[in-house]
Structure formats: C-alpha cells, structure tokens
C-alpha cells in the first residue's frame, strides 16, 4: 500500500517541475525586460550544467545593483510578494549567504540578492506581477536616493 501511495505521489513530478521551471524562466525574462540591469544569480536553465548543478525548478535569485535586498523584501511583502534574502536556516546572520558566495556572486552584490520561490501552480500572470513589483520597488528606492 505504501509503495502504491509513493508511486502516486511521484506521478507527474517531472511534469510539474517542467511547468514551474517554464514559469520561472518567464518570470526572469519579464524581470530582465523591465529591469535591464537585473542579474540572475546562479546557473541559467538554458545553459549546460554549471559545475554539475542546474537551477531548482522553483528558484529564482536575482540582484538589482543599488537595491538593498532587505529593503526590497519589506517593500515586496507590502505588495503581496513573498521574498527573502537568504534561506531560513541562515536568517539573522550578518554574513552574506553561503549559497550566494558559493555561486560566485561578488561581495558587493551579495547584499542585493533577492530569493524568490515559486509555488508549483505559479502562473505567467503571477510572474508578471512579481516582475512589476520588483520594478516598482527598484524605482521607489531609486527616487529616495
């Protein structure tokens, strides 16, 4: 019975991951289109494996030079977008994320890294909303400088 339940649970995992990855890639394309200086942290899915790793289907980590990630996360939250600056296990540390360091993100950009995790049922409409919220946040921050 357990084996049947496990097989049922695993059914469609690859399809869901591919759908989520497609929305993630669309989200990145939308971000890059309206925020040209945005930087994708980590491997791009459309390139061969980078050092044996590929991006997780629901992960998007971006930097916008000059936009402090902590401020961006607060602003995005107010706009209904959940984001973070690091994984939950490293919250509270003053050091840049060990993952961001391992990806080779320069120290001066480490404080701009914004982590977005998409749900399996994420849509292109939601991806456009994320991109728009990031742009609004970046524009608002720049106008205060």
Predicted regions and their residues:
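Glycine-rich beta-alpha junction loops
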Residues: 6, 27, 47, 64-66, ...
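PLP-dependent enzyme catalytic core of the Aspartate aminotransferase-like
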Residues: 95-145
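Generic non-transmembrane alpha-helical segments
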Residues: 26, 30-34, 75-81, 131-140
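Conserved C-terminal alpha-helix-loop-beta "cap" of PLP-dependent enzymes
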Residues: 60-114
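Catalytic cores of large soluble enzymes that bind and process phosphate-bearing ligands
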Residues: 12, 16-19, 91, 122, ...
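Short glycine/serine- and small hydrophobic-enriched flexible loop segments
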Residues: 3-11
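Conserved PLP-dependent catalytic core of the aminotransferase class-I/II
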Residues: 11-63, 67-72
């Amino acid at each position: 019975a357990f084996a049947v339940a496990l097989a049922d649970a695993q059914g469609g995992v690859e399809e869901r991951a591919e759908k989520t990855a497609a929305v993630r890639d669309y989200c990145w394309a939308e971000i890059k289109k309206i925020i040209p200086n945005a930087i994708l942290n980590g491997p791009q899915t459309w390139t061969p494996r980078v050092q044996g790793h590929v991006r997780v289907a629901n992960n998007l980590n971006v930097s916008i030079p000059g936009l402090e990630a902590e401020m961006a996360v607060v602003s995005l939250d107010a706009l209904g977008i959940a984001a973070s600056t690091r994984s939950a296990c490293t919250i509270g540390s003053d050091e840049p994320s060990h993952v961001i360091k391992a990806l080779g993100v320069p120290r001066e950009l480490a404080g701009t890294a914004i982590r977005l995790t998409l749900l399996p049922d994420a849509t292109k409409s939601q991806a456009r909303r994320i991109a728009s919220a990031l742009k609004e946040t970046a524009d608002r921050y720049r106008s205060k400088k």
